[in-house]
């Protein structure tokens, strides 16, 4: 499968980001970019064009490290949006391909996406290599995030199957969704980040190894209990019902709902809840889950308990999917797509679900016979997990290979 360029060859015109971007979520005030060590990066002047442009920047120079000049040739635009532009580039010194996300930077504020990406290091989260600032002839300041390049998105992989009237093989559904939940388990527990925009377009896939990675942390935030957040977040088809109800004190379980929608979409070949607007989105959800009870509405947003909704019975999950659907897939979807946020399983519990048991088999391989991408090299996400859950997550053959020496051992 080849990579397809998205969007026009030139960057869209960008308006400066207002301080309230991504919400009643306040951005941190930054008095001076140049004096902020955490944000320090070279500022390159006159960086208007994208495709064909060569960008040189300096990295290193901290803690006695030698300074090093790196040059990138911008090759093609791979994504555009209100945030800015993402382009593929090649490092002229090493030949390595990278993705560079270029966003307009308000000089008064820190960039939250950069701050969060610096915290993260996981096989199922796209990695930040370094960053630099650039200016244009109009004296606009841009932040450039240099990330590993992953050629495909889950959206395009699924489209590859649906355009030829095929279903994605169930093995790949398992492999991709397991890695999505593993990435979510990491960001939810280690840095404590909620992604807030999980969807197939924000899930990268390497077509050779089938490794899957979360990307685009432009909407992400560390959620603090008792602190209000904006509810108008997350792309519509994947938006949790509490967000549609206008909740502002939600939890990272909104990502679990979104991931449940992605799972259902891979199984069905199309979105499960294709609402045309927020109200229609809720109607689509009610058509499957039925009318929420007063208690479920209270769990989503206490201010809505007096609203009257048409009484619709839940559609049985086994009728939502085709007859030959594995019962474990249906069971997992039903545990993820619950009205009450606290009743949705956690990302780590989802990883341990029997739907993924095939991936834990000693002889599990890709259909072409190649080894699976890394699935069991867990990091801090296992801290606080019960021994029973860890035993279900890490297969016995993996424990034997490591002589039980993984960081969070499950006990005897």
UniProtKB/Swiss-Prot annotation:
Gene3D superfamilies attached to this UniProt entry: Phosphorylase Kinase, domain 1 (3.30.200.20), Transferase(Phosphotransferase) domain 1 (1.10.510.10)
Matching SMART domains: S_TKc
Residues given in the record as ATP binding sites: 78-86, 101
Keywords associated with the record: ATP-binding, Kinase, Nucleotide-binding, Phosphoprotein, Serine/threonine-protein kinase, Transferase
UniProt EC number: 2.7.11.1
A GO molecular-function descriptor: protein serine kinase activity
Protein kinase domain mapped to chain residues: 72-356
Post-translational modification: Autophosphorylated mainly on threonine and serine residues.
Domain of life of the native organism: Eukaryota
InterPro entries, A to Z: GSK-3, Kinase-like_dom_sf, Prot_kinase_dom, Protein_kinase_ATP_BS, Ser/Thr_kinase_AS, STKc_GSK3
Disordered, as annotated region: 1-33
Biased composition (Pro residues): 1-19
Compositional bias per record (Basic and acidic residues), positions renumbered to this chain: 22-33
Catalytic activity line of the entry: L-seryl-[protein] + ATP = O-phospho-L-seryl-[protein] + ADP + H(+); L-threonyl-[protein] + ATP = O-phospho-L-threonyl-[protein] + ADP + H(+)
Phosphoserine PTM sites in chain numbering: 26, 127, 219, 252, 342
Pfam families named among the record's database cross-references: Pkinase (PF00069)
Subunit structure and binding partners: Binds to KIB1. Interacts with beet curly top virus AL4/C4 and tomato golden mosaic virus AL4/AC4.
Entry similarity comment: Belongs to the protein kinase superfamily. CMGC Ser/Thr protein kinase family. GSK-3 subfamily.
Protein name: Shaggy-related protein kinase zeta
Source organism: Arabidopsis thaliana (Mouse-ear cress)
Upper lineage: Eukaryota, Viridiplantae, Streptophyta, Embryophyta, Tracheophyta
């Amino acid at each position: 499968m080849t990579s397809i360029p998205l969007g026009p060859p030139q960057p869209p015109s960008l308006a400066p980001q207002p301080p309230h971007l991504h919400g009643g979520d306040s951005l941190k005030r930054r008095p001076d970019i140049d004096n902020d060590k955490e944000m320090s990066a070279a500022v390159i002047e006159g960086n208007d064009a994208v495709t064909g442009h060569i960008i040189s920047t300096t990295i290193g120079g901290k803690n006695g490290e030698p300074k090093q000049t790196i040059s990138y040739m911008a090759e093609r635009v791979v994504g555009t949006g209100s945030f800015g532009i993402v382009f593929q580039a090649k490092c002229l010194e090493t030949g390595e391909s990278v993705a560079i996300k270029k966003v307009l930077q308000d000089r008064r504020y820190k960039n939250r996406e950069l701050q969060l990406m610096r915290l993260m290091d996981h096989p199922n989260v796209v990695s930040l290599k370094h960053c630099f600032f650039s200016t244009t002839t109009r004296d606009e300041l841009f932040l450039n995030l240099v990330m590993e390049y992953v050629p495909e998105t889950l959206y395009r992989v699924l489209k590859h199957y649906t355009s030829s009237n095929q279903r994605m093989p169930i093995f790949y559904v398992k492999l991709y969704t397991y890695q999505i939940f593993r990435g979510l388990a990491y960001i939810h527990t280690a840095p404590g980040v909620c992604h807030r925009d999980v969807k197939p377009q924000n899930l990268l896939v390497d077509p050779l190894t089938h490794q899957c990675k979360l990307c685009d942390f432009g909407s992400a935030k560390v959620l603090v209990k008792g602190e209000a957040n904006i509810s108008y977040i997350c792309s519509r088809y994947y938006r949790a019902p509490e967000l549609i109800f206008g909740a502002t004190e939600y939890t990272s379980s909104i990502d679990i709902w979104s991931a449940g929608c992605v799972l259902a979409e891979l199984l069905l070949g199309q979105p499960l809840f294709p609402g045309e607007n927020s109200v229609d989105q809720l109607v689509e959800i009610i058509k499957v889950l039925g009318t929420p009870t007063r208690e479920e509405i209270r769990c989503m947003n206490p201010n809505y308990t007096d609203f009257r909704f048409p009484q619709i019975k839940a559609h049985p999950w086994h009728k939502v999917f085709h007859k030959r659907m594995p019962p474990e897939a249906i069971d997992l979807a039903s545990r993820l797509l619950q009205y009450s946020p606290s009743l949705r399983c956690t990302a780590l519990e989802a990883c341990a679900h029997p739907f993924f048991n095939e991936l834990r088999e000693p002889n599990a391989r890709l259909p072409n016979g190649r080894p699976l991408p890394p699935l069991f090299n867990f990091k801090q996400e296992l801290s606080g997990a019960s021994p029973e859950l860890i035993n279900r997550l890490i297969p016995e053959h993996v424990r034997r290979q490591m002589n039980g020496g993984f960081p969070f051992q499950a006990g005897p």
